[in-house]
Amino acid sequence: MDVGADEFEQSLPLLQELVAGADFVGLDIEFTGLRSNLSRPQQISLFDLPSEWYLKTRQSVQQFTICQIGLSMFSSIEGESNKYVAHSCNFFLFPTTFGILDSEFSFQASSVQFLNQYGFDYNKFLKNGIPYMNEEQEKKIKHSILRGNWRVRSSLDKDQIKVVIDKVTQWLDLAEEGDQMTLPGIAGFQAFEVQLVLRQALPNIWTVLKEEWVIVKKVSQPQRWYLEHASCDQVSCWKEQILLSARGFSVFFQMLVKAQKPLVGHNMMMDLLHLHEKFFRPLPESYDQFKQNIHSLFPVLIDTKNVTKDIWKELRFPRVSNLLEVYEVLSSNLNPTKDSGPVIIHARQCKKYAETKCPHEAAYDAFLCGSVLLKVAHLLLQRVHGNGAVHEPAFPQYLDVLAPYVNQVNLIRAGVPKINFSGPDYPSIRPPVLILTVKRWPGVSEQQVYREFQNLCKFDVRRFTRSQFLLLTNKFKDARSVLKEYRNHPTLQVSLYRSWRHSPNITCLLQVCSIVTTWAMIAFLLGRPMP
């Protein structure tokens, strides 16, 4: 089900009901770009601590925006054993351009090309995107609205409002007190802006909104004062309603937060960063503060990438490269619990995905996330209970077996493989760091070293000294392969990095200690009395 700005407000009550009744919610987000082309030191690498990775990625999140959010609400069907219905919705979003708010964001050509390849409709994003704002933006616009201190930022709106003001001013010159005129075809945000600007500019008029037109009435100044302070003028309620419309998807985001349902994604770290930045607050500089904020918003996070990694190793499933392939393996006869697993059906208004595969459409991927979660949880449950597996498992039992994976979110290309949102991060389990010593290759660069090894395996490279480089990979077999391949190389010497042996600081300290010890020994020998 696709939801744009035209349908969003009418859909809110149903959406709230679906979230409240869900056992969990699947999530996927599509962006206008993933990572900005930063200079090499600012690019993420396997050398990064989680806090370093976060600060580098934060810049990209601030540069790009969300074009589509997919949510799939999974609810167990009452009276039916281990059966779930999925309500999957695509939300097309576009940043609020209202009053003082006017966002800037970038497009990345590769991301646009990728989504276009999978049929993404950019017209729905640009023309009918649901507005949204974070709490900081909401405070600014609320302050501006409620105080009546209004500025129009959009050049298009400025031109339209100038025409309206000129029209009303010409009418006022000939109008008598009590006369009124109608401005047709004005509704929504524009109607609000027109009324605020007219009331600010002209002290002898009053405005009333009627469906899709604004009525302007000429009044005396005492009458204007009375209308502004009269209880019958529901301006405050009207302003609150307009603010609600301007908040758009952020209203539903708060409903999602309030519901506190488990949130399920696949490689969901970027999704969480954007949720924080776009709907909650600008991303803080502190990595720990970011973790605390996300945990308070969504106390139960499950990343299916993290869950399936372990299962794939243990059951020796075929290698997969994307979420759809994960889903297909778990839905095939390779899964020993395929026939006893949960039954998942699509809601009546969401039948599209029952017949069509739509990879990289946000709602479809959100549905895949939820389905993979249920299938993997059932597999884990059977392994725990063996042949005496629970006959009619309920979702809380699935959550119990998933407990080791809760709030463990996969991290792509960093010093640790995952982030723990409910406590300290776990130590790295990456392969050991290798050190490359270069002989007879003056002026060699990190890029040249990278190209030297890229045909054998992929390493992140960091200069250590003028003739030494640190190499790091995320695969143990690659580290072993390079150590073996370059064991007797004439110009490139590769070995395991040992801090006590290779660290310049420790080497310097050992040299100083050696010198001090030598001089102490000499002094001792020279100071001994001759026999």
Curated annotation (Swiss-Prot):
EC main group: hydrolase
What does the record list as GO biological process? blastocyst formation; nuclear-transcribed mRNA catabolic process, nonsense-mediated decay; nuclear-transcribed mRNA poly(A) tail shortening; piRNA processing; spermatogenesis
* Name of the gene encoding the protein in the UniProt record: Pnldc1
Q: What is this protein identified as?
A: Poly(A)-specific ribonuclease PNLDC1
Residues that coordinate or bind Mg(2+)? D28, E30, D271, D365
What are the protein's UniProt keywords? Answer: Endoplasmic reticulum, Exonuclease, Hydrolase, Magnesium, Membrane, Metal-binding, Nonsense-mediated mRNA decay, Nuclease, RNA-binding, Transmembrane, Transmembrane helix
Query: Which family does the record claim for this protein?
Result: Belongs to the CAF1 family.
Instruction: Quote the SUPFAM superfamilies the UniProt record gives.
Output: Ribonuclease H-like
What cofactor does its activity depend on? Answer: Mg(2+)
Query: Pfam families annotated for this entry?
Result: CAF1
Q: Where are the transmembrane segments?
A: 506-526
Its membrane topology is listed as: Single-pass membrane protein
* Gene Ontology molecular-function annotations: metal ion binding; poly(A)-specific ribonuclease activity; RNA binding
Record's note on what induces expression: Down-regulated in differentiated cells, due to methylation of its promoter by the methyltransferase DNMT3B.
Q: Does the keyword Lipid biosynthesis apply?
A: no
Q: Does the keyword Zinc-finger apply?
A: no
Can you list the GO cellular component terms from the UniProt entry? endoplasmic reticulum; endoplasmic reticulum membrane
Enzyme Commission numbers on file:
3.1.13.4
Q: Which Gene3D superfamilies match?
A: Ribonuclease H-like superfamily/Ribonuclease H
- What task does this protein carry out? 3'-exoribonuclease that has a preference for poly(A) tails of mRNAs, thereby efficiently degrading poly(A) tails. Exonucleolytic degradation of the poly(A) tail is often the first step in the decay of eukaryotic mRNAs and is also used to silence certain maternal mRNAs translationally during oocyte maturation and early embryonic development. May act as a regulator of multipotency in embryonic stem cells. Is a critical factor for proper spermatogenesis, involved in pre-piRNAs processing to generate mature piRNAs.
Q: Which reaction does it catalyse?
A: Exonucleolytic cleavage of poly(A) to 5'-AMP
* Organ and tissue specificity: Specifically expressed in embryonic stem cells. Highly expressed in testis.
Q: Where in the cell is it found?
A: Endoplasmic reticulum membrane
